UniProtKB/Swiss-Prot annotation:
Residues 757-952 are annotated as: Disordered. It is found in: Cytoplasm. This is Eukaryotic translation initiation factor 3 subunit A. Residues 798-809, 856-878, 893-918 have a biased composition (Low complexity). PROSITE patterns: PCI. Residues 757-797, 810-844 have a biased composition (Basic and acidic residues). PANTHER family: EUKARYOTIC TRANSLATION INITIATION FACTOR 3 SUBUNIT A, EUKARYOTIC TRANSLATION INITIATION FACTOR 3, THETA SUBUNIT. The gene is TIF32. Residues 315-491 form the PCI domain. Component of the eukaryotic translation initiation factor 3 (eIF-3) complex. One of its GO terms (molecular function) is mRNA binding. GO terms for cellular component: cytoplasmic stress granule; eukaryotic 43S preinitiation complex; eukaryotic 48S preinitiation complex; eukaryotic translation initiation factor 3 complex, eIF3e; eukaryotic translation initiation factor 3 complex, eIF3m; multi-eIF complex. Residues 522-849 form a coiled coil. Belongs to the eIF-3 subunit A family. It comes from Cryptococcus neoformans var. neoformans serotype D (strain JEC21 / ATCC MYA-565) (Filobasidiella neoformans).
């Protein structure tokens, strides 16, 4: 069977009826009844105007019953249902929750005050009160505390805890939503006020660290989501800055300086790179910085304290909220900065919005230029003594009446100013003396004894150690001689120049006539040169300012462009979201129409069912007065009617039980006087029983003491026998111990002998093993040497064989060389015969040409008449060159050609006219030109040699 759905307004009415009974059980039942409404799946479909009173009543019950977890879950469900349609309802519910929690805390405080005021002078313990485990534990832990603390822990502490949880829950509900951003800041302000009023330092740190900073980081991280926090909006940024400044003020009032410094960083992170911040807000920012950077906090914080005062005065003057004492604080804070270098802390410099690390000289010069005429006369005189004309011998006398006349607002700077005066005094003495006594320094500061600057020997030594450690002075203290020796420091780059200027000014002051006056023209030239340098510097500075202004304008235009782009993107997203929402609303309207049609159909069917049930008598209600009828609801009404009858029966039984309870109470009321009489009687009987028990215990103690004394006397008579027996037993035990020691010594000697034999045997075996290994190693070495000798012998035989083969090869080469020489001789003879034949043919041709009667053979068809061949010497190398080439080839190298282009063979030209027909001529024409070696030419010439038969 599905669970019965109860309409929210009916659940609210039922809860109010239960609360009207005024019992704890009825409160719990009313709370459970409302919890079922939040757990229903139809909760989000219920109108907000119906849900708001239900949520309000649910919050009231959560506050009364201390159900913070249920309150948080219920608020989350209500937020998810109402954040898109009715944000005002969420704000009203959150304010109501916090108001109820604060009212509960106020009621607890008033109740505690009444109980504390009603406490008697002597605390009375009521034994009739029931003992609770919580009260027992509380009494164990706060046993030493008074009744006031115990009452406050019992009443106020739970209310404070629940109030703090309500702030945390509401901040968690309203975070990261631009629609709930106003209520978020308001709740944060109320939480700060709560922490400040009740001194909840741990809760304040938890609020700042785990809630506000985390929510701001998430807002920047998820800025692209719908309804995200937009820090570019001036109003939103202003509200966030107001919250952070209130956080800073609360941290300062609670003296949580570390949390105040983190709050300063939060404010700086919000205002960094943004314009349009109010001057009053910035003045408040720097004023809180002055409280954090205390002047007496040391050198590293005093300089930032003075810089914060200077920045505060600038913005306060711009906002028109300058304090009368502000100028004096600016100048005194600058003068109170200790001498020496300042450690660079970029984090603090960034918090002050300064371009570089501030220094004492710059702060003093700026403060003197802007505020010297505004400060009181005594502060102005202190400035002149410390910075303009410091005289170590008279400074203390002049400063003594001035520091006593300072107003209370300037008193925090006196300890730091004292250190500055002592530093100036020691630096002035170091320039004049190499060593000075401590008594002399105390005499110089003696006029300050009746002032806050009183200095004794211990404080002076402490200051010397601190100044030397900081590097303000370089000195050593001789405690025996009670003197201070100043250590000379190496001169800096401008030391001689500074000394020369000082000497020049001193001489001019003592004897002006010794220095020649500067001529008017030189003075004008120097002035013109200085003016030109100043003009160039001003021009350079103007260019830098113009460039910076251009860069700032470019950055501003870039930021505006980015902002416009982001705005266009947000508008686009918003338009898309509106279109999507309109589409969803149209879809939802269609769904509602269909749902309404279905509902009407079900209602008609339910009316028919209700009529049938009424006719059967199972339903005893007016059907016409019931709305939203359906079959399941009718069955539920029937079940509810049965439950109602059962409840009426139980109510009658409860009334009877209540009557019996009243009778029991009346009986107990009547027997209460009798109980008091019985208590007095029982108390008297207990007193008598107590006295009797004490008397019996006293008699028993006396009897026990008497028996103990008798026992002591009896045992005392046996003491001598006991001592004798004891000595005999001890001597016997000594003899047994001696015998045992002797036996143990004998066994140890035997064990030593056995161990010695084992060691000797092991050493002998080790020695034999080493000898065996040495013999084996020597045998292996001998075998290796034999193998090496055998291998060397084989290599020698192989080398001899190679040498024999080389000799045989050399002999064969010599034989080939001899054969080649014989071939060359034969070729040379053949060449000579060819040349002789060639000359003879040429001579015959010449004779035939000159005589004209020589015989010529008839020319055959297809042949070419022979032509004269050139001389042999005109083509190719000589026979000597060909011989050298032949020798080179026989030596193993390739034949080297003496000419790059081939030369036709002389034998071919000589054999052309002596050919024996066309076949012979054609065969000779088909052969390629022989451009190879010489002996082939010779062979070709020999084959083509002309015959001498048939000559002239």
């Amino acid at each position: 069977m599905p669970p019965i759905y109860v309409k929210p307004e009916n659940a609210l009415k039922r809860s109010e009826e239960l609360l009207a009974l005024g019992t704890p059980q009825s409160q719990q039942q009313a709370f459970d009844n409302l919890v079922e409404v939040f757990q229903s799946k139809r909760f989000k479909q219920t109108p907000i105007n119906v849900l708001e009173p239900i949520v309000t009543k649910f919050i009231d019950l959560c506050v009364v019953l201390s159900r913070k977890a249920h309150a948080k879950s219920g608020l989350l469900v209500f937020k998810s249902a109402a954040q898109t349609t009715n944000v005002g309802a969420i704000e009203r519910v959150l304010n109501h929750f916090i108001a109820k929690a604060e009212a509960r805390l106020a009621a607890a405080v008033e109740q505690a005050k009444k109980e504390v005021a009603a406490l008697p002078d002597v605390p009375v313990v009521d034994d009739d009160l029931p003992l609770q485990p919580a009260s027992l534990m509380l009494d164990c832990f706060v046993d030493s505390a008074g009744d006031r603390e115990r009452i406050e822990r019992r009443l106020i502490a739970p209310a404070q805890k629940f109030c703090w949880d309500s702030y945390d829950i509401c901040l968690d509900i309203a975070k990261s939503n631009d629609r709930l951003e106003v209520i978020y800041q308001s709740i944060a302000h109320r939480a700060f006020h709560f922490c400040k009023i009740h001194q909840r330092k741990a809760d304040f740190r938890r609020l700042c660290e785990q809630r506000l900073r985390k929510d701001l980081a998430n807002a920047a991280k998820y800025s692209h989501q719908q309804h995200a926090i937009n820090l570019s909006d001036p109003e939103t940024l202003g509200r966030f800055l107001d919250t952070r400044f209130l956080q800073l003020e609360t941290a300062v009032e609670l003296e949580l300086w570390q949390e105040a410094f983190r709050s300063i960083e939060d404010v700086h992170g919000l205002i960094a790179g943004r314009k349009g911040t109010k001057p009053s807000m910035m003045a408040n920012y720097y004023e809180k910085l002055t409280q954090i950077f205390k002047a007496e906090g040391g050198k590293q914080t005093a300089v930032f304290h003075a810089a914060a005062w200077a920045r505060y005065f600038q913005h306060a003057e711009r906002a028109g909220i300058v304090n009368d004492k502000a100028s004096g604080c600016v100048l005194l804070s600058a003068l109170a900065v200790p001498l020496g270098e300042v450690e660079v802390k970029q984090r603090l410099v960034a918090l002050l919005n300064l371009p570089k690390t501030p220094t004492r000289e710059a702060l003093v010069q700026d403060a003197a230029a802007k505020h010297l005429k505004r400060v009181p006369a005594d502060i102005r005189q202190i400035y002149k003594i410390l910075e303009v004309d410091f005289e170590p011998t008279t400074a203390s006398k002049v400063l003594a009446p001035l520091i006593t006349s300072l107003s209370p607002e300037y008193q925090p700077y006196l300890p730091a100013l004292r250190d500055v005066v002592l530093s100036r005094l020691l630096q002035a003495l170091a320039q004049v003396y190499d060593s000075v006594t401590l008594s002399h320094i105390l005499d110089l500061v003696k006029p300050l004894d009746n002032t806050p600057w009183a200095t004794d020997m211990s404080s002076l030594e402490k200051f010397l150690v601190t100044a030397c450690r900081r590097g303000d002075i370089r000195a050593s203290v001789d405690h025996v001689a009670q003197t201070i020796t100043f250590v000379s420091t190496p001169p800096d780059a401008n030391g001689l120049q500074t000394l020369a200027v000082c000497l020049y000014n001193t001489i001019q002051y003592l004897n002006p006539s010794r220095l020649a006056p500067v001529s008017r023209s030189d003075a004008f030239a120097a002035a013109i040169a200085q003016a030109e340098e100043e003009r160039k510097a001003a021009s350079h500075k103007r260019q830098i300012v113009i460039r910076r202004r251009e860069l700032l304008e470019e950055a501003k235009l870039r930021r505006e462009k980015e902002a416009s782009t982001a705005l266009a993107e947000r508008l686009k997203i918003k338009a898309e979201e509106d279109a999507r929402r309109a589409k969803e609303e149209a879809k939802q309207a269609e769904i509602d129409r269909v749902r309404k049609q279905i509902h009407e159909t079900k209602q008609a069917e339910a009316k028919q069912l209700a009529a049938s049930l009424a006719a059967q008598g199972a339903l005893k209600v007016d059907i016409s007065s019931i709305e939203d009828l359906d079959s399941s609801k009718l069955v539920a009404m029937q079940v509810e009617q049965l439950a109602k009858e059962k409840k009426e029966l139980s109510e009658r039984l409860r009334i009877v039980g209540k009557r019996v309870d009243h009778l029991e109470r009346a009986m107990r009321k009547e027997e209460r006087p009798l109980l008091a009489q019985d208590y007095e009687r029982q108390k008297a009987e207990d007193r008598a029983a107590h006295d009797r028990a004490n008397q019996i215990a006293r008699e028993q103690a006396i009897e026990q003491q008497r028996a103990a004394r008798e026992l002591k006397q009896r045992l005392g008579r046996m003491l001598e026998d006991y001592e004798a027996v004891k000595e005999r037993i001890e001597s016997q035990m000594q003899e047994e111990l001696k015998a045992a020691k002797e036996e143990a010594r004998r066994k140890i000697e035997e064990e030593k002998a056995q161990l010695r034999e084992k060691v000797i045997k092991r050493k002998r075996e080790e020695k034999e093993r080493k000898l065996k290994e040495a013999r084996e190693a020597e045998e292996r070495k001998r075998k290796e040497e034999e193998e090496a000798a055998q291998k060397a012998e084989e290599e020698a035989r192989a080398a001899a064989a190679l040498e024999a083969e080389a000799a045989a090869a050399e002999q064969r080469r010599a034989e080939r060389e001899a054969q080649r020489q014989s071939d060359l001789e034969r070729i040379r003879a053949q060449q000579e015969r060819e040349e002789e034949a060639l000359r003879r043919r040429q001579a015959e041709k010449a004779a035939a040409t000159s005589g004209g009667s020589a015989y010529r053979p008839p020319a055959r068809a297809g042949t070419t008449p022979p032509t004269a061949s050139p001389a042999p010497s005109s083509g190719g190398p000589s026979w000597l060159a060909r011989r050298k080439a032949m020798e080179a080839q026989s030596a193993g190298g390739a034949p080297v050609a003496s000419s790059p282009k081939p030369v036709p063979s002389n034998s071919a030209a000589a054999s052309a006219p002596a050919s024996n027909g066309p076949e012979s001529i054609a065969g000779e024409a088909e052969k390629p030109a022989l451009t190879g070696s010489v002996w082939r030419r010779g062979m070709g010439a020999r084959r083509g040699m002309p015959s001498t038969r048939g000559g002239a």
